[in-house]
Amino acid sequence: MVTIFSYIALLLSALVITLTCYIGLLKIKLI
């Protein structure tokens, strides 16, 4: 159970990081 939870947490963190980077790139392109 702990390993599955940590795996999901890792996936979520990676998703959030990619989303923030993507939004940052979009803002830079818009400006």
From Swiss-Prot:
TM helices/strands, residue ranges: 4-24
Protein localization: Plastid, Chloroplast thylakoid membrane
Membrane topology field: Single-pass membrane protein
Pfam families linked to this entry: PetL
Major subcellular location class: plastid
Subunit structure: The 4 large subunits of the cytochrome b6-f complex are cytochrome b6, subunit IV (17 kDa polypeptide, PetD), cytochrome f and the Rieske protein, while the 4 small subunits are PetG, PetL, PetM and PetN. The complex functions as a dimer.
Name this polypeptide is given: Cytochrome b6-f complex subunit 6
Chain's gene name: petL
